[in-house]
Regions:
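Short glycine-rich, low-complexity/disordered patches
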Residues: 32-40, 81, 134-145
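Short, solvent-exposed secondary-structure capping/transition elements
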Residues: 14, 90-94, 138
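Structural motif
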Residues: 5-12, 82-87, 107-108
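Metalloprotease/metallohydrolase-associated module, dominated by Zn2+-dependent proteases
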Residues: 96, 140-174
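A short acidic, often aromatic-flanked loop/helix-cap motif at beta-alpha or helix-coil junctions
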Residues: 39-45, 89-90, 109-114
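Active-site-proximal segments of metallohydrolase catalytic domains
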Residues: 43-100
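Propeptide-to-catalytic entry region of secreted or membrane-anchored zinc metalloproteases
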Residues: 1-68
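Active-site recognition of the HExxH zinc-binding catalytic motif
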Residues: 104-144
C-alpha cells in the first residue's frame, strides 16, 4: 500500500526526508512518498486559506484541502493521501483521518517527547494507515474496540467475558 504525503513549507525538507526514510525502513508492506502533482507552495497556500483567524485548521477544512489535493493531483479515490503540516488542528488533535484522507500535525511534539517530530509522526502514520486497513471509520473502530470485543487483542484465546477485571484495565472488582 502506498501513501502519498503532501507537506506544507513549514515542514523542513531535511526533517521530511528523514521521516520518509524512517517510515519506509521497517514497514515493508507500507510505502510512503512525497505526493505528486501539487507543488509545496500550492499545498501551503490552500492550508493557509483553510486556517481560521487564529491559525488553526477545523476538521472539515482539513478534508477540503485534501480534496483539493486529490483533484489537482488527479488521484484515484482509493489513494491514501496525508496532509503533513505544522498548522495545528483547532481541536488539538495530532492526527486524524477518515477513509483514505489523513492529517498529521508536525509541531508541538516536543511538549510530550524529547525526540523530534519524526518518530511520533512515523508512528502515527503507520498506526492510522494500518487502522484504516482494519476499520472503515472511527465509528467502526469504536464499536469493535469497546462495544463488541471478542477477546484480548494480545491473546484471542479467551472470550472477553471470562477475563479477570484486572486484565481489562480495572484494578478493582465491580
Amino acid at each position: 500500500m502506498e501513501a502519498y504525503i503532501y507537506r506544507t513549507l513549514d515542514v523542513e525538507e531535511e526533517s521530511f526526508a528523514a521521516l520518509l526514510e524512517g517510515a519506509n525502513g521497517p514497514l515493508q508492506h507500507l510505502r510512503f512518498s512525497e505526493g505528486p502533482g501539487v507543488s509545496l507552495e500550492q499545498v501551503t497556500a490552500w492550508t493557509r486559506l483553510a486556517s481560521t483567524s487564529s491559525g488553526e485548521l477545523e476538521t472539515a477544512r482539513i478534508f477540503e484541502v485534501i480534496d483539493q489535493i486529490r483533484k489537482q493531483a488527479d488521484m484515484v479515490p482509493d489513494a491514501m493521501v496525508v496532509l503533513l503540516t505544522r498548522t495545528p488542528h483547532a481541536g488539538h488533535w495530532f492526527s486524524l483521518g477518515e477513509g483514505n484522507s489523513h492529517y498529521m500535525h508536525a509541531d508541538d511534539w516536543n511538549l510530550f517527547t524529547a525526540t523530534s517530530f519524526r518518530l511520533p509522526v512515523t508512528y502515527m502514520l503507520a498506526s492510522n494507515i494500518i487502522m484504516r486497513g482494519m476499520y472503515d471509520s472511527m465509528e467502526e473502530l469504536t464499536c469493535r474496540a469497546h462495544q463488541q470485543p471478542r477477546g484480548c487483542l494480545l491473546d484471542l484465546s479467551w472470550p472477553m467475558a471470562s477475563y479477570p477485571l484486572s486484565c481489562l484495565g480495572m484494578p478493582f472488582p465491580l
